Every structure is written in C-alpha cells, then in structure tokens.
C-alpha cells in the first residue's frame, strides 16, 4: 500500500537539505507489506468508485492519505448526523452539531507537524514532461518503480476524455497540447501504439491526427517535442539566451517579466540555445511516424512554426509578435549561431542562463518555483553535467512533487501546505469551540511559525532579478522560499489572532520583529494603483502582454495587482494596526486606503469582482467584501459593498447555494454551473462575503437557505462531498485543491453560527 510520510528527509542523502528540518515536507512511499486485506480492499473500492463517478465529478476525493490518517488517529464520528426536514428551520443545536462534526473530522486529518496534507493538482501537462526528462536521462525506471509507473498510467487513463484526448485540466475539453504529451507519456511508460485501457493510445492518436498532427501543438509542446527529437528546433519560435545579456533597463528583458514566466523561459532559453535533442531511440523514431501526417523529412518547419490547433489557441498572436519571431528566426538566429558570434556571444549567454538556473535552484532547495520549471531546470543541469551535484540535488527533491490518490499518481504544482493550513486555522478559530480545537490550534500555530521565510535570497539578489523574501510565507513550506503576498497576509493574520490567546493553550506567540518583517514585505508589494501584487513589485508595463508566447495562457508577461491579494493584505494590516499601533502607522493607514480604492476600482458593472486564483467571480467577491468590511466599509456607507451584495443575492440558486463554472475564468463573465447546480465551497464563499457585508442584520433568509444546504450535504463521517474544481491560474488552467471542501463549508458554518444566532435563539 501507499503511505504518506510527513517531515521526512533522508539522513543518508548528501544531496537533500532543508532550512527547517523538512517541516511541511510530504512524500509518498509504497510498502508492499503494508495494510490488511480489508484496507487494501477499501483502496480498490475507492478507485472503482472514482471511475464510476468520474462522468459527474472529475476531481478525486484524495482518499488514500485520509484513510491512512483516520486510521492512525483512531477516528470515530460520535456526533449523530444532523437531519433537517423540508420546511423546517435551522436551530442553534443543528448548526453547532454540524460544525462539531466537521471540526472533529477535519482535526483528525491534521499531520504530526501541524499542517493538513492535500493534493494541489488537476493540470494535465505537469506529469508528462517529468517522464520525458527521465526517459532522456535514463532515470525513468531508476526513479519510478513498477508501482509508480502503474499509478501514473492509472492517472492518465482516468482523465482521458471520451473523444480520446486530454484537456488542459481535468474538467477541460481536449486540446492538442495535453493530448500529445499524455500520448507520448503512455508510450514511454510501456504502452503500445494501440495499447492502453479502452484503446487509450489508439483513440488519442486518432484525435491528434484528426486535428492536424503534432505540428499543430502550441509553443510549449513544440519545445518539448524538439527536445525529444519528435519535432525540429527550426519549427519553434526563437528563445535566444542572449536575452540575459541585454541591459536590465531594456523593456523586454526577462528580468522584468512575471516570475513564473521568467523561471520557465530561463531554462527554455538554455535548451534552445544548445539546440539540445535527446537520444533518437527506436521509440522516438516510431513516434515521428505515429504523430505526423507526412514523412518527418518532408515537413516545412518554418510553416509549422506558426501552426496552433484552434482548441489550444486562447491567446492569438498579434501581428507585432509574429514580426518579432520572424525577425529573430530569419535574421538574428543565423548570425548568433555562426562563427564568430557563436563563440563570443552564444556561449557566454548560455553560461549566464545557467548561472541563473543554479541560483534559483539553490535558493529554493531545488524545489524551484513550480513543477514546470523544476523539470526544465533539472534537464538543463543534466545536460551541463550528467554526473554533477546539481542534477543529483534535483533528483532528491522529486518526491516532493509526487502525489497518490484514488485516481493514480500525479505531479503537483509543488504543494499548498501553508495556504491550506492558514485557512484551516482561521476556520477553526471562528468556530469558538476551544475545548475541541486547542491541540489542533497549537500544532497549526507551530507549523505556521516554523514555515516563515527568515532570510532574503542569497547574495546580490537584486542582480538576479529577485525581491526580498524575509518575513514572508510561501504557498507550501519554508524550503520553497518564494514569497507570496496573500499567503503572507493570511499567515500573519493567524499569528496575530493566536497571539491574543493564552500561550499555554496555543503556544508562544511569534516574535514581533518577525511580524514587522512580514509587514515590510507586504508594503513593498503595493503597486501604483493601490493593489497588491502576488510575488514581486510590478516591473513591466502591461503592454508586454503583446509578446505573450504561450498560446494558451493570458496575463503571464507582467506582474500585476490582484483583488484577492489586496483584500488579504488589508485584513492583515488592519489587525496589525490594532495590535501594534506605533509601527509604521502612517504608511499602514495609507496602504489600507489605497487598497480599498483599488478594490472599489476593480468592481465590474454587475457588482462582482473577477478572481485570479479561484473560480471566479464568487471567489473574488468574497475576498473583496471581506477586505472592504475589514477597512470599515459597510452596506450603508459603501456603494461597492451594496453592489457586491446585490450580485451575490442575484445569483443564488433555488436550493440555497451558489455554483459557478470554471468557464467564467477564460470567458471573463459569470457563468453558472451546468443545470444551475450548487457547489458547497462556492456556497461557503458567498455566505462569508454576505456575512461580512452585514446580511444577517438585514435579511438572514439567504444565509439560512445556504446553511441548510451545507448542513444537509454533510456526509456521515463529518466530511463533505467532493464536487467541481475550484482553483485557477493564468485564467485558463484550473487547479484541484482537494481540502477546500472541508475548510470552507466548516468556516462558513462557523461564521453563520455567530451571525445568525447572536443570542442563541433558534429560527
């Protein structure tokens, strides 16, 4: 059986190192001797149930580790389920019992170091490049044994669409990019051209050929296929590493771009500059024949360079971008790749690109900023030196990215340990059930304190285009190292809220100097418009988006200010100002005022706000209303609050809940779930937004209806059912946050119980 390990390093591995003794690290191991026959049967039942329900629910329930942890905690739900008949109102006891059931269940899932494990997956182009990399380096069977490979195959099969393709994410329609990547992955994992479950390979290949063949794969796919030798580098748009030699004031310097874009094109520029091609094995030669519509030698690569399947083309290239690529391809590259500039310039540019790769690797303990970047940087290190320490350090961190659930083994973005935990702690604090949550809060507090980043990136970090990180919290753990404004704000809130409780109950409060460091970071990320960026200050103008080369992402070229980040920071700074009124008071007051103005300016005509990290308008409207309320804005005093409330009330469904489709994100307009279904997490977000806007005092009826839906949807053991995908990045790609279904319904019930039963009177 598979078992989840928490906080484990490897004392015998000299290539694995940590800044805080691996607190928050979560890794999976397969133990062939583990588990009773009943436990193994339960795992198989979970796998069968997932497949049976997948036409309705694409995201897994993340059951394998939950079953393990519940057994280890000897969990037994002793509070009876809450029954509320049609036409019956909610009592204070109903709300309390449902809340206690949710708390007892979720508390049993807390890990030994205080965080809540969970997968953050759902994107279907994360895993294949890892398989490609290890196929090239010869490590595929060394790193992944038969059980790993079996579970990888399971995951790929589980998420194949009926038409034979794979979507950008688990709920997406088939696209060329992910269909090609997953087809090649199946072949590298041992499936024949017509093999796989339910003729998976044959169906996928037919989809690819019916849509024009692999020359229609978007730019990132062209790069990976060129690396593999299934495509030719001359059919890709140039990514010259010489861009690292440009002066930093140059308007299109990579140092000015969004950090994720910079970290992707950093190793890509190295691979492009080297024109690296992996071993042309018999399988690669077969794939050339299987995936192209014409003989490989006859393909017009310059023409193929501009091709992209319509299913993948979210961001069509403007004319200025095509002119840029044509100029680089036809004039600049021929000069840079021939003597004398190849020796004088190209080789220097490759060295500089590699210096940046090593710098980022070391400062993230070889986790890197994310899984897309991880694989590219790891491959670059292997190309530089197959037996070098850099590559071995990358190998040591591969387990940090792998996750196993009932739908198989997948690659995570990198982890959401801190993010999930700070929301969970705030939800538990809102419950006001101290006798039942004290131990959980103490452990969570310890994890948060240990996870704070205590130093800036090493050396002259500004010359490496990095920002300060001291005082920050990351999305995952301290070793990751990358500051995030909303993660920092939510963790800062937790530390301050817990500091107001007895130390003998929740542990010693964090040193004020560490809070000051956090505030310093947050203030540094406020932009000219008053909003907060996510990772770094804005360095580039938004017109740079004209050069977005990705085809299927939007808003990827420049850092920008976000409503959710701004709201989280406002809430944290308001509380900080109350507890530390003498620290940078004027700056904090001004920051809050500017943040409020930014949120108000971003409201859409229908009263909603567009979300960047959750789906979508409901998510951002919850954040916006919470931030405005924290700053003292009320329904009476603020038009934006009234419009936000009106938006939420207008889209409430007949069953009392709310439900929004992931299509809202790319379409940039509110789209309800098909059939006007409700989603419990989105219902919780809407409830909390309304509660913060004072809905309970005006007319609590919408809240009662929503709470009834959540309570009556609770499962026998206190869990909540898994429903639609809820996270998003870059507007087009969705993420599955598996623990959201526990945190937010619990949190909403806690807030509802306080707001609707202020005097403990039943309805």
From Swiss-Prot:
One GO BP: triterpenoid biosynthetic process
Gene: LUP2
Any Pfam family: SQHop_cyclase_C
Positions annotated as active site in the UniProt record: 486
Keyword Isomerase among UniProt keywords: yes
Annotated catalysed reactions: (S)-2,3-epoxysqualene = beta-amyrin; (S)-2,3-epoxysqualene = alpha-amyrin; (S)-2,3-epoxysqualene = lupeol
Family membership noted in the UniProt record: Belongs to the terpene cyclase/mutase family.
Keywords on record: Isomerase, Repeat
Protein name (Swiss-Prot/TrEMBL): Amyrin synthase LUP2
Spans of repeat PFTB: 149-190, 592-632, 641-682
Transmembrane residue ranges: none
Organism: Arabidopsis thaliana
Stated role: Multifunctional enzyme that converts oxidosqualene to nine different triterpenes, mainly lupeol, beta-amyrin and alpha-amyrin in a 15:50:30 ratio.
